[in-house]
Amino acid sequence: MTNLNKKPDWIKVKAPNSAEYYNTKDLIKNLSLNTVCEEAACPNIGECWSKKHATMIILGSVCTRACMFCNVKTGRPDLLDPHEPQRLAEAVQKLNLKHVVITSVDRDDLEDGGASHFAECINEIRKSSTNTTIEILTPDFLRKEGAAEIIANSKPDVFNHNVETVPSLYKTIRPGARYYNSLSLLHNIKKLSPEIFTKSGMMVGLGEEINEVVQVMDDLREAQVDFLTIGQYLQPTKNHAEVAKYVTPEEFQYLGRIAKTKGFLMVSSTPLTRSSYHADEDFQKLKENYQQRHTVA
């Protein structure tokens, strides 16, 4: 097992310092937008922002949940900003994004969990950036009747909802969520709009067993999920769950090979894999893999 007191070399990344990085940072600040890149202390922020890639957080910056893996602020959430969809669309247009990823904090305080706000953001982007493909990474909408229908009707190109970890760790790592609710949400979106690609991700290094990871793969395929991401859990602060193990690149490759045998259209399994990392390139590969699988010989 790798020494847990320091990150192994395969986790280390260069500090961001490019002009493109700072241009992206300034644009996001000027439009009063939030990004998961900053809020979650993502290790890939330098690379992504240098390429003008950013994952936008909507519905404010304060979450109603307190998951033990996440660095986003928790507490009493902000009031909904009715102008946020327009500002988001403006950022997408100014960054000239071919593919945008939109995520959010959990909003258990809202009647629909924020589903209609996601839909408004998608609609605004479609108006001004007609060729931009849209990926949304949503919360679980636990006990929010009708939320899945709102999301499915808004027709994102990719619907992503992360199961995050194995079910045995939910009580300690993701206490406000329910594993089977997450599976049900993913399955419902696919049933409501089969043309939407579905995606889910999980972290490893939290103390899970490999047989549990494989069972999650099977559960996600049963829910007709197309794309699986697996990445290393990194402790944001000392107040969060500790890293139980730094999984080696070879072990990630092994997990990736197993996942591919399960029938996913696409698998990304590396230490630095995150839900929206290389999302634009992965979307193109996802479409190509779908077309290849459905081409009649």
From Swiss-Prot:
Pathway(s) it belongs to: Protein modification; protein lipoylation via endogenous pathway; protein N(6)-(lipoyl)lysine from octanoyl-[acyl-carrier-protein]: step 2/2
Query: Which residues are noted in the entry as [4Fe-4S] cluster 2-binding?
Result: 63, 67, 70
Task: Name any cofactors this protein relies on.
Answer: [4Fe-4S] cluster
Q: Does the keyword Iron-sulfur apply?
A: yes
Radical SAM core domain residues? 49-265
Q: Which GO terms describe its cellular component?
A: cytoplasm
Signal peptide start-end: none
- Free-text comment on the cofactor: Binds 2 [4Fe-4S] clusters per subunit. One cluster is coordinated with 3 cysteines and an exchangeable S-adenosyl-L-methionine.
What residues does [4Fe-4S] cluster 1 bind to? 37, 42, 48, 276
According to the UniProt entry, what is the EC number of this protein?
2.8.1.8
Protein family per UniProt: Belongs to the radical SAM superfamily. Lipoyl synthase family.
Q: From the Swiss-Prot or TrEMBL record, give the protein name.
A: Lipoyl synthase
What's the source species for this entry? Answer: Rickettsia akari (strain Hartford)
Taxonomic lineage is: Bacteria, Pseudomonadati, Pseudomonadota, Alphaproteobacteria, Rickettsiales
